[in-house]
Amino acid sequence: MNDRALQDDVIRALADAPYRASATWRGRELADAGRVERFARFLARHFYHERIVHFFKYSRALARVTARLPEAVLRQPGFDALLSTAVLGERATARAVARLVMAYVAGEAVPYHEDLLRYQEAMMVVEAGPRVWRDTSRGDDRATVAHPPPELVEGTELLELEYDLPTVLPQLLQPWTTPPEAPRRKTSLIVARSRHGRVAVARASDAIASVVRFADGARTVDDLARAAGLRPGEIAATLRDLTEIGAVRFSTGS
């Protein structure tokens, strides 16, 4: 094993608890297992502290009425237990951490808090997962008749909420004495991430939500247009916008 491979192996062990516990890693005997475990857990706490503070910033602002800071979950037994299976940056681990936060800060002090928690969870989970660090693709992804069937990008989430959260989110981060109110009306949001890790949120009309639900890589653009009730120009524009935010891509088949 060369120096680069050795370095990669150590980094993987620090980030991947199941690998750290494997016979493959332990058999290498590269470092004291106890010290590696302690350092790995330190890194995990730092990694998820940053993400919780960032993605659950709205619940953090509401701590004035809930008396629960989201990042305090890092000191709870549930998070300690999770560390034995955690893989830093993986979607499954991000979802598990987000669920711990949701359970910890949940309450009825703010009517729309449940919607808010789901929104923040989606942001944290969608941000996780592998990235494309160097773009080697050629051409563009604009929706044209030459494209194969579009499909939903893995990790994209369609949120159907009871409250219009986008109207209240900026207010939550401003000074207030009583929590700002959110209009109670059905709201659909698409949360998606580009291949390079940029997370975007967009409102979704019923037609756009239909496109997201039915874009499975099997239905053609015409099929999606009929399902959503969109004209050719409208479906092309919709797919172009969804592709731009990373919600949809065009399948190339197998």
Predicted feature descriptions by range:
Residues 148-150:
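Primary mode marks residue(s) on the alpha4-beta5-alpha5 output face of response regulator receiver
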Residues 142-146, 175-178:
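Short secondary-structure capping micro-motifs at structural edges
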Residues 154-216:
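Low-complexity, glycine/alanine/valine/leucine- and proline-rich hydrophobic stretches
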Residues 1-144, 194-254:
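Long, charge-rich, low-complexity alpha-helical segments
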